[in-house]
Amino acid sequence: MSKEKFERTKPHVNVGTIGHVDHGKTTLTAAITTVLAKTYGGSARAFDQIDNAPEEKARGITINTSHVEYDTPARHYAHVDCPGHADYVKNMITGAAQMDGAILVVAATDGPMPQTREHILLGRQVGVPYIIVFMNKCDMVDDEELLELVEMEVRELLSAYDFPGDDLPVVRGSALKALEGEAEWEAKIIELAGYLDSYIPEPERAIDKPFLLPIEDVFSISGRGTVVTGRVERGIVKVGEEVEIVGIKDTVKSTCTGVEMFRKLLDEGRAGENVGVLLRGIKREDIERGQVLAKPGSIKPHTTFESEVYILSKDEGGRHTPFFKGYRPQFYFRTTDVTGTIELPEGVEMVMPGDNINMIVTLIHPIAMDDGLRFAIREGGRTVGAGVVAKVIA
């Protein structure tokens, strides 16, 4: 069928609904699929289909997440919605569902609530780049001034967390009325979809980013030199290009003298491919798993960073007891564990299994990192937490 082929050429954008419990995130998700299917074609998803979210595992953590898809004339969207607050926290920290932008749902009847604030903060910490506000349940508020007040409050809250609160789009609607087919409220869903298209820029594809390959294995091939293997995380490496080996030890430059995949020689290795890269003038013992191969100057090694972390509950196979300052677990980045120490926020004495917490980590070896890098926290090979680098410090 020709339609299927056409769909694949559209830009693909990942979004999700965030916000306080019972403010209508799942109802809005259902309304978007329903109204867009009716307007532009595609399939609608009912509330109970979305609310009954399947379990997934990401970095050893079980998360309930619903994925729906919908189309505007310009784009194809993959949209994630979580049933419970804990699922949002886990989802955002593990990066199980990366969001190019989020729809913050705030009930006009309540205004911003504690989880509204927490989701905005998490969005800031884990690097959700754009937020669009959907003020829900506006059919239940007759007072125009009250709506103005709620909108102002939400904008101020977003500004407080470094989002452009004064400039970002706010749509006033009613997900339930739109779902029930009332035309004036359906129009608000179309307005929201228009903002998804115009306000969230098309994400940069992995292949267009600077080259990076996390090293999984190192071999010595007599007469040819040293080969490192791994899956190209982003970008392209071409034969003859200069690369840097970053992390754990001092950064070293080399040249890629060959790329191979399944024993065949290639001119280049691209994002998503498992390749072997032959390096000039590098000894087998100069390089190890856990380092990365990268475009020169594109990534630096760091030891200290601020992080947002979720600690597994006992039921999830995590610790049975809290930990305190001075805790020294392993931090698993990409392909290797590095021991690190932690610094808890002022006034926090201990962290319980099932908590999420902001903490400063200092590693004993530097690791190639940027803000937004995900990691696992492990004790003797067992995952006890997941985290994200919120801000590199040193």
Swiss-Prot record:
Listed EC numbers: 3.6.5.3
GO (cellular component) term, any one: cytoplasm
Reactions catalysed: GTP + H2O = GDP + phosphate + H(+)
Signal sequence region: none
Membership in a protein family: Belongs to the TRAFAC class translation factor GTPase superfamily. Classic translation factor GTPase family. EF-Tu/EF-1A subfamily.
Region G4: start-end pairs: 136-139
Residue ranges of the region described as G3: 81-84
InterPro entries in the record: EF-Tu_GTP-bd, EF-Tu_GTPase, EFTu-like_2, EFTU_2, G_TR_CS, P-loop_NTPase, Small_GTP-bd, T_Tr_GTP-bd_dom
Region (G5): 174-176
Identification of the protein by name: Elongation factor Tu-A
